[in-house]
Every structure is written in C-alpha cells, then in structure tokens.
Amino acid sequence: PGQGRAAASIFAAGIWVWSNINENLAAVGYDINSITLAAYDWRLSMHNLEARDRFFTRLQNTFELNTRLYGKKSVLVTHSMGGTVMFYFLKWVEHEAGPQWIEKHIESVVSISGTFLGVSKAVPAFLSGEMRDTVQIPQVLSYLLERFFSSQERAALFRTWAGSASLIIKGGDAIWGNSTFAPDDTVNATETYGNLLNYVPMDTTKEFSPNVTDAQRHVTASAMSEWLMQHTEEDFKRMLESNYTLGFERDESRIRSNDKNSITWTNPLEVALPRAPSLKLYCLYGWGKPTERAYYMRDGTSQDVRDEREANRDVRNATLTESKSTGKPRQISRIDTRVMAEDHTPVPNAGGLMGE
C-alpha cells in the first residue's frame, strides 16, 4: 500500500480523509517529522498484514524511534476499521515485546468511530453485496452498478477480503440484543434492533411456509455467524474460523489464555485490555446521525431475481447462473427496499432499520 500522509489525505475530488486533520495539526505546530501515517492494506487479515508487509513490526519501530528522538511517548489516532487494527496491534506488541512496551511508548489512543464490536452493515454486505449506500442510490446509477458489477459479484469480492471480515459484529445477543429486546431499542419501539436480519417473502402477497421457523425469519446476532456460514462458501468459512472470534468471554482464566491466541486479538470481548496503567483511550463517535442497525431481507433463488430484473427491463443475468453442483437456481439474499411501514417504530428506511 501507499505510505506517508499522501496515502490517505484525499480519496477523490472533494472527499478528504485525513488532509483536513493534518492541516489543523500543522496549525498548532506539528510537522512532517512529528506526524506519521501508517497506511495498511485493509483487504488482508491481521495475521497477513504482518506476514506479508511486516506492518506491525514497522509500526512498533516507528513508536520506538519517536521515543528516542523526542524523549516522550506518542499518541495513536485511528479511524473506523483502524480501531480494530489498533487493538490487534496493542495485543500483538504486548505479546512480542513484553507487557511494559505500551506503557513505555504510547501516551494515549484516540479512536474515531472505531469498529471494536463490528458494524451491522458487514452482514448484508457479505450475504448480498449490498448496504444502505448501494440500495439508496438513484435508479439510473443503480441500473449501471448492477449491469457492470452486480450485487452477487460484489458479495463474492467482499468475501475474498479477509480484513473486512474483522468488521463482523461481535458479542452476540448479549451486546446486540435478542428477538424481543435490544439495549438501544427506543421506549415506544414496535420493532427490535435485536433481530439483525428480518426476512420477508419474495412474493409479498404470500406468507412464509409453515415449515419456516421464527428463527429463520428473524436472525439475531448470536445466530448470525451460523447463518453466515450456511449462506457462504467453504473458503470463506475456513478464513473466518482461522482468523477471528465473535464471542463474549466471561471466564478470567480463558481471557488470560486468549492473550496468547492471535485469532482473539480483534475481539475486545475475549481478551484483556493492555497492561498499561497510564494509557488513556479516547473513543469519539458521532451523535444524532441515523446509522444502519438492522435490515429487512428477502430470500429467493437467482431465478426469482432474474424474473424481477426482466420485469424492470434489466435482462442482464450472466452472474445469476444455476448452481453447477445441483443444476438448481442459487439461493441468494437481497436487502428488501420494498418494506415501507410508517406505523412501525423505528420506521424502515430503504430496507434498513436506522439507530443512533
């Protein structure tokens, strides 16, 4: 990946990443010698960031150099998925360099919109290649996107990026709620955020078969990982199991043993915080901005989706072929933007339930 501040200053014309922050830091005395940007390849798993790029070793060396040059500890600032990478780094360096390293070299950590417990949008992205960003774009752009890079092609691509799997939600129902209640439900809620995925029939004029259980129509966080495994290929399943854990550990002895197990280092619910008494952790999040929390989904075959597209005069179907192993249309999921229930609280928005 590109390195230095230029690697993440501006994403595109009018869209800045770190450039405005860099400019404001420069105004209060920071310069190129005192600011380092650690760019990483977010497609890679945490293990492979070190195995291929020696990313964490380089980051460790940067902190040690700063301590020698300036005689004081550094501040680590992260954004979004960078928060997860940062937490893995703290556990990695504690394991590799000893329990005193963080206390010696890092003054504080500032996490901006950190993804420590994952994000809801990761689940539909892996299942369907969709999220609110894609289903709400104008119809013309949606047509072009589906024509040249379909949702199923996007989902297949997302599932090859082991790094993005670190964004899958962690902690199960204890954190995200169950089928009747979630901690962030509003007082007058008629729908609970605990049902992360709410499936509706492909044909809205029909009901689900009696054989479809409530657990199949409403998928909670604890059931989500198994649901994801059932709807994705073996390669993705092996990658997930060999790189990440999604649980919530309460046993102290197991938490201590997890400190030696690198697949738990992206999950702050299964490992202890770093042994650094003076380390300060600042977590900054937006307030008052609607955020994706749960989804309405429709589950049908590739033939169902092909028929729907043909009805809309979108006859491209190259990516919706039949399964080679069974000869039957593939089972796929889509965010269901048809669901518009003004009498529900929260009100569905383009197939999503928005939370704080």
What are these regions (language model features)?
Residues 1-160, 165-194, 199, 211, ...:
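N-terminal non-catalytic accessory region
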